[in-house]
Amino acid sequence: MSDTKNPSSTILPQDYDPENDKGEFMNSVMLEFFHQQLLEWRAELLRESEGTIQNTLQSTELQKPDLADRASAETDHALELRTRDRERKLISKINKAIVRIKDDDYGYCEESGEPISIARLKARPIATMTLEAQERHERMEKTQRDD
């Protein structure tokens, strides 16, 4: 990766918005913006999961003598575990996006190689495909499921 695109050596201007950046697509400032977004998102998810481990999993709610209370606690516990599993998968996608930034592949569609719109990346920084490619992919998946 070239020094001109190294996000870790770039200082992000205050109130920076990559949609207003008229420079080269995925220049070092854009990469740093998304790198910071991904790091903050991952840190937030990790904090939440630590809270779950400390609160939910160590709870004595599942040991309640009343069946209705215990069933309710088990349902809450199962929902919390499913949520944490989804977040674990999301953290994996965030880690892959961070690797793509370091490898200079971030922001480009893995299917077509075209740039992914900045608006899409701001909404979903882990996006790996353009909106059009994602829609095609989802239509193909739906067709295969319907067969």
Role assignments for model-derived ranges:
Residues A119-A123:
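Short Cys/His-rich "knuckle" micro-motifs
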Residues P115-S117, E138:
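Short functional micro-motifs and their immediate structural scaffolds
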Residues Q134-M140:
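Extended, non-catalytic scaffold segments that flank or surround catalytic motifs
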Residues C109-S112, T130:
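Short cysteine-rich clusters marking metal-coordination/redox-active sites
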Residues R88, Y106, A127:
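Residues immediately within or flanking Cys/His clusters that coordinate Zn2+
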